[in-house]
Amino acid sequence: MSHKINSKPFILHSEFKPSGDQPQAIEILAENLNDGLAHQTLLGVTGSGKTFTIANVIAKLNRPAMLLAPNKTLAAQLYAEMKAFFPENAVEYFVSYYDYYQPEAYVPSSDTFIEKDASINDQIEQMRLSATKSFLERRDTIVVASVSAIYGLGDPDSYLKMMLHLQTGAIIDQRQILVRLAELQYTRNDQAFQRGTFRVRGEIIDIFPAESDDRAVRIELFDDEIERLSLFDPLTGTGFGAVPRFTVYPKTHYVTPREQILDAIEKIKSELADRREYFIKENKLLEEQRITQRTQFDIEMMNELGYCSGIENYSRYLSGRNEGEPPPTLFDYMPSDALLVIDESHVTVPQIGGMYRGDRSRKETLVEYGFRLPSALDNRPLRFEEFERLAPQTIYVSATPGPYELEKSGTEIIDQVVRPTGLLDPEIEIRPVSIQVDDLLSEARQRADRNERVLVTTLTKRMAEDLTDYLDEHGIRVRYLHSDIDTVERVEIIRDLRLGEFDVLVGINLLREGLDIPEVSLVAILDADKEGFLRSERSLIQTIGRAARNLKGKAILYADRITNSMEKAITETNRRREKQMKYNEEHGITPQGLNKKVGELLDIGQGGSNKSRNKPRSQKAAEPATTYAIPMTAKEYQQQIKKLEQQMYKFAQDLEFEKAAAIRDQLHKLREQFVENG
């Protein structure tokens, strides 16, 4: 079936023109891509407008693109920026749609099986469906994705085959439309009209497409003919006018044509027979009973409904792939000439490499103990070498590219060191460790008096806590950025720092996202001469760069000797400073401070909720696990639920599934007790 592709050009909206190193970087990147170069690196310092450069390259080449970010927060920032640059084009967001995800797991030592438990974010699910739809329908598409893009997704061929094409004047009876909608996993709901549902009133069928958030389609039939197709707002009912044709996309990426499902069922039955034989031979009768019961239940569900819970575990059969072949992913939905941009590549590339192994070990346990068939091992993220094979022409973007990017790019490393604002990299000073705490106290006071902010990085949690208490006792408004804080709270703390709610932020790893804050004029690195991951050349350059958005930016490294990493970081920072000063001198540029507005919290994946912004916060932003008494008031109940949920998410994240499950059960009990007590 031919699929209609919309070929609208990219139209870049910006009040700025490329300046500094940007014009040259745009030119070289675009030229290399046109010449077919597979790998190149944009070495762009903090605040040099790397995103703007990439946006210009995409607009210049007029090719679809995928931007990979290392986490949801950075992906959300990139998405917001790209949406502002390309308001007339399809800018999409593709990250994991789980707010909370505990995969099914088995712990042999305690004979504990933990069912899969997940909370799916409806808004992000809609955005994922919208992203694949745009890749299939439009050339002017930019998808901003997290590493979720390398995880298995439904097969694009099956997905395309299942689409329902509607056209004014087409002959089709109402029953046929309803059957097709059920096959697409839409449910009928005449009361609550929401995403992925349809309602029927006489000869009118209203469908709320799964990938849409503000448009629904109305089919008006006359006998067995589609008399009119129109779009309307599902909330207000306001009409947007008639359309000649409309395509309804499936509600999930895992829909499969009926004949393919029947074919898959036969293969699953055959594998089940082999597995049963194996378990009986090994005298593992419990495992044999377990796999038989679970698989037969799934087969029955697939036969009756066309899907089952955990259908992705049978994706090898549903997509018709052979054992060990890579699963279909977002890369299979991309046009063949798309670009791949890997942001913060020094973090993202190693992340891609690490996803496969963790997933594999958990699934092998499930297979060994009869919870899953061996074919479930093919529902997995891509291996690194598979990712390399599938990746189109790639631009790596980082202020400190890793060894992989440097090796792949060879000589094609494009420097973007000069900032359009003329801002220089921070000055670096080295001071002795013996005076670090008192010296920091006096520096923090000076900055607070000038309404500027300070970031402090320590090596240990204990040191960070003690330093926070010490500064607090001496009248400094300080907060400690805990590693246990969830992303939303983290964004709020950073927002409060920018608004001047406090002046000093202490943390261990300040390389994480969202810390490019124009108000920060001082970065203090304690114990800078202790070699290790947090004091490596790359980490030091990144941390020093946190003060690069301020006119008076300065970095103080407290050290008694200059390590190899320090020397390299200082040399690189000074190289950049010299290049920036020379450019400013030649072009008569006076450095300008950044006046970046403090925006509202980005509500992607938060359901637009800023509810915790006004709550009083303790000095420490996360608390250790404690035992809980039965709450007496509604407020106490809410606080306790929140604490327990935070712990549960943390345990699930650390793969401590037993502990997460125990807290989940505690939550259920707590809710029941509260309801009983009225």
Curated annotation (Swiss-Prot):
Domain UVR: 638-673
Predominant location category: cytoplasm
Signal peptide: none
Domain Helicase C-terminal per the UniProt entry, residue ranges: 436-602
Region (Disordered): 603-625
Record-listed ATP binding positions: 44-51
Motif position, Beta-hairpin: 97-120
Helicase ATP-binding domain location: 31-417
One example GO MF annotation: ATP hydrolysis activity
Keywords per UniProt: ATP-binding, Cytoplasm, DNA damage, DNA excision, DNA repair, Excision nuclease, Nucleotide-binding, SOS response
GO cellular component, one term: excinuclease repair complex
GO terms under biological process: nucleotide-excision repair; SOS response
Domain of life, source organism: Bacteria
Localization terms from the record: Cytoplasm
Subunit architecture: Forms a heterotetramer with UvrA during the search for lesions. Interacts with UvrC in an incision complex.
Function: The UvrABC repair system catalyzes the recognition and processing of DNA lesions. A damage recognition complex composed of 2 UvrA and 2 UvrB subunits scans DNA for abnormalities. Upon binding of the UvrA(2)B(2) complex to a putative damaged site, the DNA wraps around one UvrB monomer. DNA wrap is dependent on ATP binding by UvrB and probably causes local melting of the DNA helix, facilitating insertion of UvrB beta-hairpin between the DNA strands. Then UvrB probes one DNA strand for the presence of a lesion.
Family membership noted in the UniProt record: Belongs to the UvrB family.
Note on domains (UniProt): The beta-hairpin motif is involved in DNA binding.
Protein name: UvrABC system protein B
Organism for this UniProt entry: Mannheimia succiniciproducens (strain KCTC 0769BP / MBEL55E)
